[in-house]
Amino acid sequence: MKKHLIILLIVINILPLFAQNNQQRFSRYILANSEVGYITFLDGIGNLEPLWFEAKLTSNYLLRVRKNSSTGAVITPKMILRMYQRDSQPVATPSYMPQITFYHQLKNFHPNRAHIFYLFGSIVHHSNGQDGDFFNLDGTINTDDGSFSTNYFEVGFFLTKLLKFQENTTEFFRSYIEYHPRFMQDNDDLIKIYGNLRWHNDIQIFKF
């Protein structure tokens, strides 16, 4: 009887730890798949015009229905700031890119399972806070104060893989479709120039 009681107490103590690890991994994996801020100096990322700096300011807020739920959502307010190398060193109006992403874990975490699969879908807004014409008089795109705004969806999956050769290291593979519906656009010229469908793939490795 005493032996059975000890075994029962051990099981009772282990179950909350396993549940806690499951919850922690869910939150950790979801946030690892979310937006990350950065600051770059001089050139920025993907910009042709000289910059002093570019900064992406972002934070992620995880929402879950209950602690042991396999479904959750992340709200991400995001802004991008740029200071140009011009007279008076102006800081341009920020780009606003808030989004909400919904996640669903297809299989519960298990210590012996190396792969965990998630589905996700996002609703994203992107605008630059300007009110000028989209095109210049010569027909080129107005990158100075041209009004830019778009809304779109992202749908895809990401897969986590625990790397056995490196402790506490996880590999993420993500693939998703970005779709810009015409009825959600303020300007059809954006779709004519850039299209409304894109396919993204990326691989990340995190050490927690």
Specify the residue positions occupied by each region the protein language model found.
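Short glycine/proline- and aromatic-enriched beta-strand/turn motifs that initiate or cap beta-hairpins
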Residues: 19-65, 100
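Sec-dependent N-terminal signal peptides
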Residues: 4-18
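Generic structural signal for short, flexible, solvent-exposed coil/loop and linker residues
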Residues: 6-7, 48, 64, 110-112
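Outer-membrane pore/translocation modules
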Residues: 21-35, 73-207
